[in-house]
Amino acid sequence: MRYHPHTPDDVRAMLDVVGAERVDDLFRSIPQALRLDRPLDLPPAADEIALFSELRRLAARNETAHPPFVGAGCYPHHVPPVVDQLLLRGEFFTAYTPYQPEISQGTLQVLFEWQTFVCLLTGMDVSNASMYDGATATAEAALMAGRITGRDKVVVSAALHPEYRKVLATYLRSTGDEIVTVPFGADGRTDLAALAQAVDGRTACVILGYPNFLGVVDALPEAAAIARAAGALTVSATAEAVSLGLLQAPGALGADVAVGTFQSFGNPMSFGGPAPGFFATREKSLRQMPGRVAGATVDKQGRRGFVLTLSTREQHIRREKATSNICTNSGLCALASTIHLSLLGKRGLAELARLNHGRARMLRDAMERAGCRPVLSGPYFNEQVFDVGDAEAVVAKLAKRGIVAGAPLARWYPDAPHAKGALLCAATELHGPELIQLFASTVRS
């Protein structure tokens, strides 16, 4: 049975409304020479069995290697099957904004719980209902700092994720704000002397990775003290959120804003995304926070309910009063993270974080035995840089053996010491002792 979405009467009614005689009139602005006047060259329709067979054939062309030893902002972690199962529920399976609270209580409650998790892990007072990703959350933090301080300069650590820095530059291009990048030292941490010299009375905020792109746990308390002395805000950006189960919360170390992504919770790597961004800050900055907030309230019958509140985005209020124009965001990804964190619990998250750090130590020992020394001396979580001689060559050779080796740092830091041999490698709970030993011995060979 064929399905015809529009009957001739339907088409006639729509044409009458728009004042057109024929459907072709709607395309009058397109020159005749550019119009296709023949049927599309498509293969005949396939039945379901043939279609799945063709899709499997195409999928088999992909080269897969799981788990990879590459992190660089997107990390391989185990996702419990129940996460995907709950995501498929009809009440949840959308990323769209829950504008009607009376029919969106489930989604709103999940976003409320998401905000709770974000605040618990970051040590902040308030969180919004998620951002697009970690990079845009970082850029929005810089914009918020400018609104709060009235200043037009942002100081960024060179060890912040390079793609976060690129997105930040894109956002600030339209505002005219100045971006000053300060180097990192031999330990992989931000150079505090250079930071102190760069921060002045024009500085709106200082932005550091925590941990940073090099896998190093940066000097957040010291950087926050420098920023505070100049009246600037401190922004911590976390791409590997599992680290927050082991490290001190950014808020406890002096950060005024904590941003990043929860990709590590409930979201597969999926070629780099999508992944939910998070944004948390102090209560005094609540009305300058971008996005929207899910809040708990009571209806006229006295029953607890959830609504969107303090939605200071331009779709809700006047553009000149809005703090952002974030629209339909990563709500479904945020739901996945919320489910995963609920399953882990406080103790489970701490155990997962310790396991990740333990696997990173195991990788470090194995690589040192293989003659590949660590490049940086700073403290690390589950990611670190090794000197493998020729990083690009090692990556290419290991790819032929079905191993994704890591990220050559020279792609982003061509002038850094040991740049040619520097390979950024991550180890998570998915990398068992045998796999780590295989990786190290293969690199050595």
UniProtKB/Swiss-Prot annotation:
GO biological process: glycine decarboxylation via glycine cleavage system; nucleoside metabolic process
EC number: 1.4.4.2
Transmembrane portions of the chain: none
InterPro entries found in the cross-reference section: GcvPA, GDC-P_N, GDC_P, PyrdxlP-dep_Trfase, PyrdxlP-dep_Trfase_major, PyrdxlP-dep_Trfase_small
UniProt cross-references to CDD domains, sorted A to Z: GDC-P
PANTHER family associated with the record: GLYCINE CLEAVAGE SYSTEM P-PROTEIN, GLYCINE DEHYDROGENASE (DECARBOXYLATING)
UniProt similarity note: Belongs to the GcvP family. N-terminal subunit subfamily.
Subunit structure: The glycine cleavage system is composed of four proteins: P, T, L and H. In this organism, the P 'protein' is a heterodimer of two subunits.
Protein's name in the database: Probable glycine dehydrogenase (decarboxylating) subunit 1
Gene this protein is translated from: gcvPA
